[in-house]
């Protein structure tokens, strides 16, 4: 994997789909350090803008889905970096507490020295008077995903909270399946672990049309609460 990924890696993404029937298409470019788990990108809405909903519901597919950029500690095998040069895919369902539902599929590949992401989105049932469709979301709180192996692929589950006006939070559950394009026999699979993510929309460059985003991510065991039985 070291020969394919550098300390600074550029990436580009295409995200398209519909939310409550509204079609959109976004493109983005950025770079980051895969081994330190940090990345920044700029995303532009090239069709369907300005977005009539909060961009936040797409931002998790931009970066929370950019799994190459995670700093793993405690010797955890890096499933995603091992997957190159072939790459990997993931499928995710996100269920919001107000009834909103979003599905996403992402393909990660390597084109020369550049990571390429292609994302398809389908969002439905977001209430017209809710913070998503009213575009009143504030920020994502930091979140932790639990990650574990099932039949040669990785599964992830997490609870995320979107800060809204008045001190409220809109929560959502994410269920994701990660699939390497390499056979499981060619990979060293990680055990049960946690991945901490912090996603920040740094700037809305043009309202509903252009955003700058940052993420930091760390993969870890439960080291802060050590096991007396020697478990990770």
From Swiss-Prot:
Reported biotechnological use: Fluorescent proteins have become a useful and ubiquitous tool for making chimeric proteins, where they function as a fluorescent protein tag. Typically they tolerate N- and C-terminal fusion to a broad variety of proteins. They have been expressed in most known cell types and are used as a noninvasive fluorescent marker in living cells and organisms. They enable a wide range of applications where they have functioned as a cell lineage tracer, reporter of gene expression, or as a measure of protein-protein interactions.
Cross-link (2-iminomethyl-5-imidazolinone (Met-Gly)): 63-65
Domain of life: Eukaryota
Residues bearing PTM (E)-2,3-didehydrotyrosine: 64
Residues at the site labelled Cleavage: 62-63
UniProt-listed GO biological process terms: bioluminescence
Record carries keyword Plastid: no
Protein family membership: Belongs to the GFP family.
Name of the molecule in the record: GFP-like non-fluorescent chromoprotein FP595
Organism of origin: Anemonia sulcata (Mediterranean snakelocks sea anemone)
């Amino acid at each position: 994997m070291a020969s394919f990924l550098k300390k600074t890696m550029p990436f580009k993404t295409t995200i398209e789909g519909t939310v409550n029937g509204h079609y959109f298409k976004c493109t983005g470019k950025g770079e980051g350090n895969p081994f330190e788990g940090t990345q920044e990108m700029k995303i532009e809405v090239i069709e369907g803008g300005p977005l009539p909903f909060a961009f936040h519901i797409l931002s998790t597919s931009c970066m929370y889905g950019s799994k190459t950029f995670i700093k793993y500690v405690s010797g955890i095998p890096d499933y995603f970096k091992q997957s190159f040069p072939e790459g990997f895919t993931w499928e995710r369902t996100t269920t919001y507490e107000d009834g909103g539902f979003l599905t996403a599929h992402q393909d990660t590949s390597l084109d020369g020295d550049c990571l390429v992401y292609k994302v398809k989105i389908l969002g439905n049932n977001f209430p017209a008077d809710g913070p998503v469709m009213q575009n009143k979301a504030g920020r994502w709180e930091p979140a932790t995903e639990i990650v574990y192996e099932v039949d040669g692929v990785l599964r992830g589950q997490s609870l995320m909270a979107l800060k809204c006006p008045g001190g409220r939070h809109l929560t959502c559950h994410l269920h994701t399946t990660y699939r390497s394009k390499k056979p499981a026999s060619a990979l060293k699979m990680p055990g049960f672990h946690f991945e901490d993510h912090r996603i920040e929309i740094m700037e809305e460059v043009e309202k509903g049309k252009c955003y700058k985003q940052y993420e930091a991510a760390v993969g870890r065991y439960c080291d802060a609460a050590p096991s007396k039985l020697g478990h990770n």
